[in-house]
Amino acid sequence: MFKVAIIGDSASVSGFASLGLYVFCETEPQKVSKLIKKLAVNNFAVIYITEPVASLVQDTINKYKNSQLPSIVLIPAIRGNTGEGMRAVHEAVEKAVGSDILKN
């Protein structure tokens, strides 16, 4: 059975445990990179990661960009957001349907 994880600072991710996600409160780049690799080989289909933490481990995230699993999805944190998560959603939508239907 596939699992869903979330990685980020405690204030941003701890509430997701009540939704059944595996919560990992981690912000140190080396530990986050190791964690992503570990989750990838342990049946985690989706890994949500806060934008500020994702910016620290972009090389690791890029290794999984063309992989079927896991799907790594950037989400906003309580603070320190870059807008990268939303840009990624816009790019995916544009690639899928041929135009950015989410554009304001």
Feature-to-residue mapping (PLM):
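Short, charged, surface-exposed secondary-structure boundary motifs
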Residues: S33-K38, T82-G85
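C-terminal structural segments of small proteins and small subunits
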Residues: N66-N104
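N-terminal first-folded block
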Residues: M1-S33
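Extended, charged amphipathic alpha-helical "stalk" segments
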Residues: K37, N62-K63
